[in-house]
Amino acid sequence: MAAGYRSPTACGRSPLASEGALGIVRFFMLFSVFYLSLFLSVGLLLARRAVPDGSAAVIVPLGCGFGVSLLAVLPALFAVVLGFTLPTVILAAAAAAGIGAALLYRGTRLRGMAKDPDSGALWACLLPVVLITLYLLHTHVLHLVDGAYHTGQSCYGDMPMHLGFIKYIAQSGEFLPRYPLLGGTHRFGYPFLCETVSSVFVVLGADLRTAYLLPMLPAFLSVYGMFWQLARRVTDSAGKACLAFYLFFMGSGLGFVYFLGSADSFAGIFTGFYTTPTNFVEKNIEWVNPIVDLLIPQRATLFGWCVLLPAVYLLWRFCYEGERRLWPWLAALVLPLPLLHTHSALALVLLCLVGGVYTLAQGLRRKTLLPWLGLAAVCGAAWLCQMLPTVLAQSLDGQHMLRLHFNWINGQDDGTLRDNYFWFYIKNIGLVYLLLIPAFLRAKPKQRWLYGGGLAILALAEFVVFQPNNYDNNKLLYVWHILGCILAAQLLVDIFAEVRALPWRALGLAACCFVGMFGSVLTVGREALSDYRQWSADDMALADHIDENAGSDALFLTSDSHLTPVFALAGRRILCGSGSYVYYHGMDYSAEYNAMRALYETPDEDTLAAWDIGYAVFDSSVYAKFAADESWYAARYDVWYENAACRVYKIK
């Protein structure tokens, strides 16, 4: 290797050139912020129109949900015809502006919103969690430290995949996109709209970090704000909403007990890799913290909940409070949900089915049934159009997808359970699970019906698995858990309200909060301290060179490391991606894997031509896995790029 090589794209610029490049980066960043602001402004107008009685504490998070939904829908609609290109992104902005202008013409204004005495409680409740989230996003997403990109524990595995999908869709312009982690043409059976909401900013010229983070900010505000508003609407109490919020986002089970045996064991929480009170596989503890292990690393979950939680809020008002006029707004909000997060779409269907049964139980009346039929018709048509060529087709003919399996990850393939069914959930979920039955019995009838939708989700998730990884059924189980936290918080507040002595009331609530949240506090602390180098300066230089010199449709021969910068940072197609991605997406990748191994260990020109390989990469990950014959390539092809970490040969 050329140890002294300096990439012209990463080093050696004059100070004047560097300042000019920095100015361009700032311009595109500001332009991207303006673009996002347009969609969020229209989202706020839609929220204001949907719930004209809402205060700013409702309109802001609900508007973020509408804005992100628009950001997913509008570019995708134009991209079907024009590809995912700059004209598509511009037309999407024009369409959003047109919707906003129409709303303004109809008299929709953001001023004059209702006053809400509980709005201060909302923002005070959200502030600590928002600050934690912002810090973790800063340190976990392409965090530049001493010239290298660093990340935290939870993003080390999933984020390279998301970065690669985002970059691939933007730089290729393909829509519907091909699956870029395998050679040839494969269906993209993953809900990719959670990636296109960032791809738009890459198309606009933003750097990858900015593009990745920008839409996540309103998405988090929607998730946090609308959870709180849903809980307050259901319980009619700001205090219960605050407790429910922390029971869910900072809740945990009894996993912390396993670390109290010694000082070394407790210290291991903060130094080990996934040895936390909410993620300790050795002891069958896998009910993870939703902030650090679901929302931050898993974009589909974040953007799914960004739409799902506002949708459940509207569903509560539409179904259980009789506001039938809300059905068109609910339908508009959830249009992209199947390709944002398929599990959230399925959860919403089950909640709506139970809500529909509740409506029928109140009596057959035309004015109550027609809105349900309208909602079903609009969503059914829109969702089927999205799902038939993508996630639904993948579920039906993908590898190890739709199948029967009992009790989530506690169930084993031979039908036995690792732990007793109830003990498994007691030690994983803890206090909330123990309170579910008394909380349900104490709940009001409408609350029981809503939770009945959660029980339908639980029943389905406990018997049917929808993907190769049994663990991923937690995307359904957490929706059930959301509703359980709301009922449990209501029960706790009601019980302790009957304790007259204020010190005892405070002590009792504090004890419950400690038992119900201590594990997550430790987990979040571990995540904040975690720091791993993800890509070196040489990896970044390689990605820069590919960006500037390789064709958008080039296929690279690389190792199947999940960190390969060819895909993760440059967004180029590779012959065979990591099994931790492609297997769990239901793909049959045996042909690509065998070809990858053969092309490294026993290469021949016919196989290269058959797979249409454009470039072959040799780096430490290749030599760690294969007995690679680089000399064969060196004798036949020119070195296209070289630095201290890799050599790349141009095949054609």
Where are the language model's segments positioned?
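Active-site lumenal/periplasmic loops and adjacent helix-entry segments of GT-C-fold
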Residues: 130-307, 342-346, 532-533, 560
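Membrane-interface alpha helices of multi-pass inner-membrane proteins
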Residues: 292-295, 314, 327-342
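Extracytoplasmic
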Residues: 500-652
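Transmembrane alpha-helix segments characteristic
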Residues: 130, 325-336, 351, 373-378, ...
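Hydrophobic/aromatic-rich transmembrane helices and adjacent perimembrane loops
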Residues: 217-220, 301, 346-349, 469-497
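Hydrophobic, aromatic-rich transmembrane alpha-helices
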Residues: 310-318, 351-362, 427-448, 494, ...
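Membrane-embedded, hydrophobic transmembrane alpha-helices
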Residues: 11, 19-118
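Perimembrane helix-loop-helix junctions
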Residues: 315-325, 330, 334, 347-379
